[in-house]
Amino acid sequence: MAGHSKFKNIMHRKGAQDKKRSALFSKLSREITVAARMGLPDPAMNARLRQAVITARKEGLPKDNIERSINKAAGGDGANYEEIRYEGFGPGGVALIIEALTDNRNRTATNVRTIVSKNGGNLGAGGSVSHGFDRLGLISYGLAAGDAEKVFEAALEAGADDVSSSEDGHEIWTAQDALHEVAKALEPVLGEPDGAKLAWRPQTQVTVGEDDAAKLLKLIDALDDDDDVQTVWGNYDVPEEVMAKLG
């Protein structure tokens, strides 16, 4: 976890990739199926599905799995998933937004509440923390896309609102309703992104010390282990020296 970029501090990684590959594939497949059901089951005609497929390919999801997930939606097979959001607080007073795709609201609510409470946090009512975040589009690129100047100029030309570059890559922020339009405009210049999705960006961040950081990351890992949880967003900032100690 060392070397977190600003965004990786906001959105905790999906566990150790080598240990959680099958779980990650399951989440990616679920997002593809949901995206296909929400529009046409054709990536060329469905912007959310196209980005889900691009992200899945970047993460190494086999082509057969991608096609099977799309066909499942087209054929009306499998569970009907709905998007659910939970809000609350973790150790150190960190605000958390937990996004899930579930076919059973009661199961997911019980699991999420149990995980949060067992790890030093508590869930609040809807809207209890989201007022402290901005709902924006986020497009992520690796360093191979180009240097900071090239990415900034491309993002500006494409209509992005903000760009952040670091040793970990580039984060391009857009208005919520401009995400897919900007992502499409960037591809001829920067290539396919590592990811493009709606995100929750905190208006302010909470610096977390070593003790609270260890508890917080344990909580986020536990949430990530739940099959229904897709993404965990937070307003925490863990200093590099603390991250190094925690490994």
From Swiss-Prot:
Region annotation (Disordered) ranges: 1-21
GO annotation, biological process: regulation of DNA-templated transcription
SUPFAM superfamilies per UniProt: YebC-like
Stretches assigned to coiled coil: none
Domain of life according to the entry: Bacteria
UniProt xrefs under InterPro entries: Integrase-like_N (IPR017856), TACO1_YebC-like_2nd/3rd_dom (IPR048300), TACO1_YebC_N (IPR049083), Transcrip_reg_TACO1-like (IPR002876), Transcrip_reg_TACO1-like_dom3 (IPR026564), YebC-like (IPR029072)
Gene Ontology terms: cellular component: cytosol
Keywords: Cytoplasm, DNA-binding, Transcription, Transcription regulation
One example GO MF annotation: DNA binding
Localization of this protein: Cytoplasm
Amino acid composition bias (Basic residues), ranges on this chain: 1-14
Primary site of residence: cytoplasm
Family: Belongs to the TACO1 family.
Name of the protein described by the UniProt record: Probable transcriptional regulatory protein Swit_2142
Native source species: Rhizorhabdus wittichii (strain DSM 6014 / CCUG 31198 / JCM 15750 / NBRC 105917 / EY 4224 / RW1) (Sphingomonas wittichii)
Phylogenetic lineage: Bacteria, Pseudomonadati, Pseudomonadota, Alphaproteobacteria, Sphingomonadales
